[in-house]
Structure formats: structure tokens, C-alpha cells
């Protein structure tokens, strides 16, 4: 399915840097942009109110908040249990302790059902394989498998668009700046695992990744913007 044939999309929208940047871009490309946010009892559930506020501010077509608290019951993680501190070290299985098993499987499934009801042709999600947190459900192969499952399971043409898949964090900041929304993304989104808007706590892994990317972009704007244009043009991982 070509982008030209898509007019109505559903954005998986957490209120964080990545999904907000995807939402901003979608508003320039599609006629109808619908957001869906998931409340799974997450540690940083302040992001839900941030998502609501941003949805109104950016004037998207509609915004749905879904209660998926069953995920909290099933998936034990530092993001679903306040008693488990966020760690900078990997667990024995090689994954961060902030990994929530099945989260993106559930989110994309529900977003697919929502898209079906709306008659939307695509789902947009801000997952990224190039500069990511080590989550297996952020990988390109996973997304393509989910897309195939949704198409076959609902007998409907449906594309999962991943604008950030092959971008690093600096390039994601550049993308927000390209749409003149760098300040909004920097100061009004919530990426921090401890629920602090903007630059966050500065200590959790999410804040470290976000800060490092921002510093890289601000120090090398022209170079990063050029690399963004190249990555966007090819749609492939950069050497």
C-alpha cells in the first residue's frame, strides 16, 4: 500500500517523544489522524494526561484512551510494578527490566481493531530498531509479522507504518525540528520512566537515551538533518 493511497490513520500515542513526533508528521501527511492511548497501570501513567493534552493541542481528529489493565496483571516489569526499581543493567535473559512482555503485541492488535472500525488504512507506531531500548517488540521483523497477522486475521488491507524504525534518537529530534515542533516535543512530552515531563528525571534509561540524542542533534544540527533526509529517502538502515 502506497502512502498516497492512505488518507486515514491510527497513531499509537503514548505522549512520549517518539509517538508525538510520529503524530506531528502524520498531521502533515494524512486527512484524518486518530490517536489511541493505552492505560495499563504503567509506572509513568502521567503520560496519559500528557497524551490527552497534546491530542487537544495538536487538534487531531479523535483520541481514544483504552483501559488495558489486564496487561498489568499478566506482565511483571519495572514499568508495571512500582516496587521494582528501574535498573540500568540487563536481566539474565538479556532484556531490560522495563520490558513489558506482549505490550506491543496487544497495542498493535487493539489499534488494528480500532483502525478496522474507523475504516483507517494504516497504523502508525514510533518503534525503532536503530537506537532502541533492547525491546524485541520494537524490531522491524516483529512489526512486519504483526502486520501480516492483522491483514490475515481481519481480511483487510492494513499497513503498519514505522517512521522512526531506522532513525537514531538524534535524527528523531531532527524530525521534530523539521516540522517546527522541537520545543513542543522537548518541553511537553513525557518519556521519563519516573513520570517527569520534559527533560525528565535525568537518571532513568529513557532519559539518558533522550538526552544523549538531543545533545547530539543540537551539537551537529546540519550533519544530523542531512542524515535524516538520507534515511527518510531510503527507508533503510544507514551504514
UniProtKB/Swiss-Prot annotation:
GO MF term list:
ATP binding; ligase activity, forming carbon-nitrogen bonds; zinc ion binding
Q: Which Pfam families match?
A: QueC
- According to its UniProt record, the EC number is 6.3.4.20
The reactions it catalyses are: 7-carboxy-7-deazaguanine + NH4(+) + ATP = 7-cyano-7-deazaguanine + ADP + phosphate + H2O + H(+)
Task: Write down the InterPro entries for this protein, in alphabetical order.
Answer: QueC, Rossmann-like_a/b/a_fold
Task: Tell me the residue numbers annotated for binding ATP.
Answer: 13-23
Named in its record, the pathway it takes part in is: Purine metabolism; 7-cyano-7-deazaguanine biosynthesis
CDD domains this protein is in? Answer: QueC-like
| Required cofactor(s) | Zn(2+)
**UniProt keyword Zinc, yes or no:** yes
- GO BP terms: queuosine biosynthetic process
UniProtKB keywords: ATP-binding, Ligase, Metal-binding, Nucleotide-binding, Queuosine biosynthesis, Zinc
Which amino acids does the record list as binding Zn(2+)?
192, 201, 204, 207
Annotated disulfide bonds: none
As to how many cofactors bind and how, the note says: Binds 1 zinc ion per subunit.
> What PANTHER family does the record tag this protein with?
7-CYANO-7-DEAZAGUANINE SYNTHASE
Function recorded in the entry: Catalyzes the ATP-dependent conversion of 7-carboxy-7-deazaguanine (CDG) to 7-cyano-7-deazaguanine (preQ(0)).
By sequence similarity, the record places it as follows: Belongs to the QueC family.
Q: What is this protein called?
A: 7-cyano-7-deazaguanine synthase
- Gene of this entry: queC
